[in-house]
């Protein structure tokens, strides 16, 4: 997968001149949306099928600061999938002559229908289910 590139905007920085911590969750979402498009399962397609994928947990480890105009490469991968819960992993690296990993994190998701019930992925979305299982298996191998 091609990493998602985010350029830090001035409004994302705080009084100390560094990227405010809350913006990293937004960057994760931007990268996840791009990742899903690269997989051929954009969120718009899932919503057309009546499937939503809410975030149920987020975990971040800040390793180094970023500042205005930094470019951050965000590598996204499927960390785990058990047929119900999907864990997405993120590694953010500040680009430049000496790239620096600035954040590692995870977000956990489930798949729900319009009534808020769990989607039976294996039965209702078998191609997507298989893709996620393969990607999770590759991560754990």
Question: Each predicted region: which residue ranges?
Answer:
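HotDog/MaoC-like acyl-thioester-processing domains
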Residues: 2-4, 37, 67-68, 79-141
């Amino acid at each position: 997968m091609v990493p998602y590139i985010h350029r830090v905007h001035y409004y994302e920085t705080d009084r100390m001149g560094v990227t405010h911590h809350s913006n990293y969750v937004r960057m994760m979402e931007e990268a996840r949306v791009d990742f899903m498009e690269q997989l051929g399962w954009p969120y718009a397609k899932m919503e057309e099928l009546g499937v939503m994928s809410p975030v149920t947990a987020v975990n971040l480890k800040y390793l180094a600061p970023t500042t205005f105009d930094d470019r951050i490469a965000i590598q996204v991968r499927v960390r785990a999938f058990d047929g119900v819960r999907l864990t997405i992993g993120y590694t953010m690296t500040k680009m430049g002559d000496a790239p620096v990993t600035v954040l590692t994190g995870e977000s956990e998701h489930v798949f729900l229908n319009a009534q808020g019930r769990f989607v039976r992925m294996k039965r209702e979305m078998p191609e997507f289910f298989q893709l996620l299982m393969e990607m999770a298996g590759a991560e754990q191998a």
